[in-house]
């Protein structure tokens, strides 16, 4: 597998709709950087967040997930409590080609503040807004800035198309819009 460069990412965004909306340059003045980089794409976080809370004494069970585990916030700056967690989604909608796997890595500025972003791989054929998981590993409240860069996607091109894509197997997170909570089917 090869890591794909800016020229390839731009071409796939423009001809295939791989990233929408697509920012064809790196924007970084006064904000967490976002847009096209040399070998990746820095995606923005939307302004809708779900922040873990224990107000309702909920238990986190991935097989029977309670919406009472979160409080919803729509804001330009999300404050994640100490040692807590929040969900959000990307501003960008992704459509991954059948011969590509996308891997997400965190932003160094957030990581240096104890904020970890986790996203599982974007499988070949997958489409949707990416649900982002933010962990505040510090004993202090931490800020996430909406509509600014949150993570970077790196695109790996396979030698050929896969036999069965995420779309072919009717993956449970296909075509997600906004924040999608855990699903066990």
From Swiss-Prot:
GO terms for molecular function: dCTP deaminase activity; nucleotide binding. It is an enzyme of class 3 (hydrolase). Its EC number is 3.5.4.13. Keywords: Hydrolase, Nucleotide metabolism, Nucleotide-binding. The keyword Hydrolase applies. Belongs to the dCTP deaminase family. The active site is at residue 133. SUPFAM superfamilies: dUTPase-like. It catalyses: dCTP + H2O + H(+) = dUTP + NH4(+). HAMAP family: dCTP_deaminase. DCTP binds at residues 107-112, 131-133, 152, 166, 176. Pfam families: DCD (PF22769). The keyword Hydrolase applies. Pathway: Pyrimidine metabolism; dUMP biosynthesis; dUMP from dCTP (dUTP route): step 1/2. Catalyzes the deamination of dCTP to dUTP. It comes from Wolbachia sp. subsp. Brugia malayi (strain TRS). Homotrimer. This is dCTP deaminase. One of its GO terms (biological process) is dUMP biosynthetic process.
